[in-house]
């Protein structure tokens, strides 16, 4: 198996010294650099760079700068996704994000883990686990999502949370480690939006 194949199979792989992976990361970093230095008002150029980075035709995806990712092609984005400023997608493992997802500033989605034994760690070994984000979710600022986590549809993750385990759908979850506080009523509202119906 190539190191890339090992990475995608969630096996230990050489993350630091494999030239093919180094080249793929360099490609993504160059595109991120260009995106981060493109005027926010130049929407056509930004759309072109975002599609090139993720190697797909995105549908109403908005990314505030600065933004960083390792590969880009291993991020699967739904439609109507908003990524606020200074977010990082560590996409050695696949990151799947559903439709209508709001991601606050300074959020990180970290698919990689390293050996605890520093001898192995110093040899460049790494393992990547997927992250799955359901549609209609919202992340407050400074949220960290760790490898192997699934966050269910319609959930809200409070600012500063560190998500180490799965979060069920329609949950309000906060903290370090992130825990469910209560369920969210995501039924279609029968009343007009006001201070009472917002909670």
Swiss-Prot record:
Name the keywords, alphabetized.
Answer: Acyltransferase, Repeat, Transferase
InterPro entries (UniProt xref): Hexapep (IPR001451), LacA-like (IPR039369), Mac_dom (IPR024688), Trimer_LpxA-like_sf (IPR011004)
The keyword Acyltransferase is annotated on this UniProt entry: yes
Q: Where are the transmembrane segments?
A: none
Keyword Acyltransferase among UniProt keywords? yes
Highest taxon of the source? Bacteria
Q: Which PANTHER family match?
A: ACETYLTRANSFERASE YJL218W-RELATED, GALACTOSIDE O-ACETYLTRANSFERASE
Q: What is this protein called?
A: Putative acetyltransferase SAR2635
Give the organism's phylogenetic lineage: Bacteria, Bacillati, Bacillota, Bacilli, Bacillales
